[in-house]
């Protein structure tokens, strides 16, 4: 388990490129036949990926010991979105078939967590966010057909994008975790611009659907102290509450956003005008 400490905004603005990447970038999300796990002190979120190829992958008691409990979800909830081939997640003996861009919410108290791919040649890529939970909500599958896509932006400003809200109160109950998937239209490059911060939640982005010769310049920092991190395909970035989180790519891309914190009000954000950025 890779543990990332919290960092003050005054400290963050003094960091060079390497230090910024060390603090906020998660470079390796998917590793064959393993799970990856990054524990952030910021709102205690855990972020990672699971890619079964030649055999199933189980998250067992070894993780619980690192969290001071018996199992990962003794005091946590888990949200998973599959960005790879078809697979399944077995929760306490119950199999849930999870296809490409299907998602599964797993509530507090689940013990057995086993992840499998249907085909080794096209393995599932289970990306997950995990957050502290105060009560148990039912495990539930969410497919793209269950979410109401919202298209925002304009081709003229290169920010036309479709937002798919998977884990939000209108779709299912969670303790604090929100997750969704945003896809840029072809030829569009900007996400979340004009940008914002939200004092009551932190956020993590996973960028994917990127070609090998492309990248995203992820914008972060306080609005008057902006920095950037160069992102490649299937990499994630941690965004503290005080930081903007926006990006511009060399080509169109897709990203998954996950939020934890004080509330789940999607529009609870502090907007930043473009002319106020520095």
Swiss-Prot record:
Query: Any idea which GO molecular function terms this record carries?
Result: 4-deoxy-L-threo-5-hexosulose-uronate ketol-isomerase activity; zinc ion binding
- Role noted for this protein: Catalyzes the isomerization of 5-dehydro-4-deoxy-D-glucuronate to 3-deoxy-D-glycero-2,5-hexodiulosonate.
Lineage, please? Bacteria, Pseudomonadati, Pseudomonadota, Gammaproteobacteria, Enterobacterales
HAMAP family the UniProt entry points to: KduI
* Enzyme class, first EC level, given as a word: isomerase
At which positions is Zn(2+) bound? 196, 198, 203, 245
The biological process GO terms on file are: D-galacturonate catabolic process; D-glucuronate catabolic process; pectin catabolic process
Organism in which the protein naturally occurs = Salmonella newport (strain SL254)
Comment on bound cofactor: Binds 1 zinc ion per subunit.
Q: Which keywords fit this entry according to its UniProt record?
A: Isomerase, Metal-binding, Zinc
EC nos:
5.3.1.17
Known NCBIfam families for this protein?
PRK00924.1 (NF002091)
Cofactor names from the entry are: Zn(2+)
Pathway listed: Glycan metabolism; pectin degradation; 2-dehydro-3-deoxy-D-gluconate from pectin: step 4/5
Question: What is the designated name of this protein?
Answer: 4-deoxy-L-threo-5-hexosulose-uronate ketol-isomerase
Q: Which reaction does it catalyse?
A: 5-dehydro-4-deoxy-D-glucuronate = 3-deoxy-D-glycero-2,5-hexodiulosonate
- Note the InterPro entries from the entry: KduI, KduI/IolB_isomerase, KduI_N, RmlC-like_jellyroll, RmlC_Cupin_sf
Task: Determine the domain of life of the protein's source.
Answer: Bacteria
Q: Where are the transmembrane segments?
A: none
Family the UniProt entry places it in: Belongs to the KduI family.
The record's CDD domains line, in alphabetical order, gives: cupin_KduI_C, cupin_KduI_N
